[in-house]
Amino acid sequence: MENDRGEIVDLYVPRKCSATGRIIKSKDHGSCQITIAKVDENGRAIQGENIIYALSGFVRAMGESDDSLNRLAQRDGLLKAVWNPQR
């Protein structure tokens, strides 16, 4: 879509669920996006250094959002000592 100046403008940019890989539709009002900031040794957020997770309403409705967030954070190296049934 273009505006009157000829610039490309999108009204909606679809996201993918970080846990399942499904596309989050525009009418999925149960979805959420969580941004976790990376911090320095003093505990202050580093500007521009963050990790974004998007969880679909399907994952949240199944009650799997906390487990999915733990799994994703472990994969990205944010968590280390979380119980895992595969171990």
From Swiss-Prot:
One of its GO terms (biological process) is translation. Component of the small ribosomal subunit (SSU). Mature N.crassa ribosomes consist of a small (40S) and a large (60S) subunit. The 40S small subunit contains 1 molecule of ribosomal RNA (18S rRNA) and at least 32 different proteins. The large 60S subunit contains 3 rRNA molecules (26S, 5.8S and 5S rRNA) and at least 42 different proteins. Component of the ribosome, a large ribonucleoprotein complex responsible for the synthesis of proteins in the cell. The small ribosomal subunit (SSU) binds messenger RNAs (mRNAs) and translates the encoded message by selecting cognate aminoacyl-transfer RNA (tRNA) molecules. The large subunit (LSU) contains the ribosomal catalytic site termed the peptidyl transferase center (PTC), which catalyzes the formation of peptide bonds, thereby polymerizing the amino acids delivered by tRNAs into a polypeptide chain. Belongs to the eukaryotic ribosomal protein eS21 family. InterPro entries: Ribosomal_eS21, Ribosomal_eS21_CS, Ribosomal_eS21_sf. Keywords: Cytoplasm, Ribonucleoprotein, Ribosomal protein, rRNA processing. The keyword Cytoplasm applies. Its main location: cytoplasm. This is Small ribosomal subunit protein eS21. It comes from Neurospora crassa (strain ATCC 24698 / 74-OR23-1A / CBS 708.71 / DSM 1257 / FGSC 987). The keyword Calcium does not apply.
